[in-house]
Amino acid sequence: VLATSTNEINDQLSAVVENLGFQVIRGSENDVLQRYVDAAAATNADVVIRITGDCPFVDPQLIDEMLGDFISSNIDYMSNTDPPTFPDGFDIEIFKMSALLQSAEIATSPFEREHVTPCLRTNSLFSHKNKAAVVDVSHLRLTVDEQRDLDVVRGIANLFAPRTDFSLSEILGVITTNPHLITGNLGIERNEGATMNSGQKLWKRAQQVIPGGNMLLSKRPDQFLPEHWPAYFSKALGCTVWDLDDNALTDMSIMGIGTNSLGYGHPEVDAAVAKTVRDGNMSTLNCPEEVYLAERLVAMHPWAEMARFARTGGEANAIAIRIARAATGKSKVAICGYHGWHDWYLAANLGTENTLAGHLLPGLEPNGVPENLRGSVLTFNYNRIDELEALISTHELGAIMMEVSRNFGPEDDLLQKVRNLATKHGIVLMFDECTSGFRQTFGGLHKMFGVEPDMAMFGKALGNGYAITAVLGKRSVMEAAQNTFISSTFWTERIGPTAALATLDVMEQTKSWEIITKMGSYITEQWQSIAKSNGIAIKTSGLPALTSFSVDSKFALEYKTLVTQEMLKKSYLAGTSVYVATVHTKEIVDRFFAELEPVFALIKECEDGRDVKSLLDGPTCSSSFKRLN
């Protein structure tokens, strides 16, 4: 009997098995225990022999031996995996129907329901027995969970073809004379699927079909907690995220990478979007909301007169660069900050792969970026006006693009000095506010410093989770967009600007920037407080609403990993940065710090000599962006 799920992905498998003349029973994807109960009941089974689909080589002779032993021993449950001595992939479980039914009544946790037999194996109500191999060969991996496993199994099967009745002893003989056959899947942990969360399982699948595994470097699990990060979400509301195993996790981390300053699923924003979905998101005609949004943003920034929209921050910055170059007729650009992934930006690394080390990540290779862009993008460090002056004195610059504030704010009137230089030399000054916008002011952070750019780019928080970015600028610059080609179909969809208009309404009504700035300052103070009480040296940085800390230690990354690991066990998504949302109430934050304090005590123990790596359940997280806000 094949007991598989009702998921349509198994339709083809079910059809093949039925055509071969075998019975197929289908049931729940996640409640596999109930699926087994249904399959056993449908066939009037007294005894169930469980062979999972990842064990293609399982030996019929071994099954017969174990079944005879099971019947003569009159026990409830028998396996050959507790402890394992046979190769991974030769797993056999045998149990009474009565025991299966009883375990189905007892087992309540999602883990027990998914993995069928944990209750049978661990509950004292059931009698057990284990079948041991004459020689322990449990180090061999002959199961099929990953592509590497399939390659190994195929290599062995091909040696026996066309036979399909080869035994375990024959396989061991082939491996002895051809040890290279089993090198392809070395290093994969036995039964890792039994302890791996659903997110990690999907992440392993993702890496087979998506280069890098996902679309955003900042969301890769190795940036947080390698091998254990939940990786994917099923739903999100407020500051709670549910993973694929339906665990509710409080997000005290980066809130969608800064996209949701009003919290996930804000009712007013979502209601506006839902109406747009009902009324229609696209048509041959333009959506009026793009006009309303342009007028709204221009009114908020009196120096600006025109706007263009896109759907990602990288696009917005690329649009701005194109317009600035068209307006000035000059191709060279000076940058200070992180401005996306496009060719124009990564061209900075054509001279050396470390040019962007202090702006984004060290070691970025500009593969695929045309060599003829070399020298078109020049960098200067934040708060180093002398470096910008040197660039201007030796290059014909068309534009300066920079973040208004980085991990630390401007010193010695930096922004005004940059403005003065740009004006003096006829250079277009652009402020990248994709991350900093709407965090500390209603609009661009530059408003707080009283310095007006020629162009500014906004994103992330503008749509509270919906894709919308904006390029604002003076008419004298923006009209150059008509002298080049900047156009894209999905920049005309309606959901983005609708969400932005609703988001701006809520922000203005609640003064959201004041709320998140105040709470961000409080979070920073709490980090400093528990660090001081535990005798730990930390450094804090970033805008209050984009606050972060790092332990001043050579083990800073290990400590970041430890924080994430221990707080995940307490149902928090956490690390060393918090992108604050209005839904982060004092009650939520105080509860978080009450749980975090013991982790800081652990860090102190490690600073005093305890091995931090001995506390980690997996590898250390990767280093992330140099720029956090």
Residue ranges of predicted features:
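PLP-dependent enzyme catalytic core of the Aspartate aminotransferase-like
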Residues: 508-510, 518, 569-629
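Active-site PLP attachment segment
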Residues: 53, 90, 449-481, 492-499
